[in-house]
Amino acid sequence: FNIHNFIAKEAVPVAIVMMIIGLNYASILTFLKPFAEQRHLLEASSYFFIFYAVASLITRPIAGRMIDAKNENVVVYPAFLALIITFVLLVFSYNGWVLLLAGVFLGIGYGNLSSSMQAIAIKVSPSSKYGIATSTYFIGLDIGIGFGPSLLGLFTDSITYTQVYLIMAIVAALCTVLYLIVHGRKVHGNTY
């Protein structure tokens, strides 16, 4: 057994960023329904992930071309901003259209972060480790999405869903800074 057969050390920083992004996403997967029930937005919430999927489907090909033409930062920073806006919109969603707009921003934010971070994990790794780098990326994502509901559930007795989403906006902002530190500041010009 050798850990390097399962983890690409070059991709670990990006996997950690993705773990935190996964935690953000898990908060929506876990709490959207009870949050929407509290706000009387249950019907609109049933369309939330359709709006997410359409926004992601439209923006991912554009983001891919932007990364190829420039570099990953031209997509990653706006995607982080979109993720932050997602949570701000959720906090202020008292009608269905605002909730659905949050779904659009989630598609732009999380949808593009997930594909961009996977590309970065591969980019920073030697070609002999592309498969392991992809695995490392998904380990980070799976930890965030898998343990996120349990971790966040520890606090839902003492804070509201609105407060959870406000905290997630702050976490997304801090994750942007973490990305800057572990990768973003190293990117200059066209890197592809």
Region annotations inferred by a language model:
Residues 11-49, 57:
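Extracytoplasmic gate region of multi-pass secondary transporters
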Residues 154-172:
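A membrane-interface helix-boundary motif in multi-pass transporters
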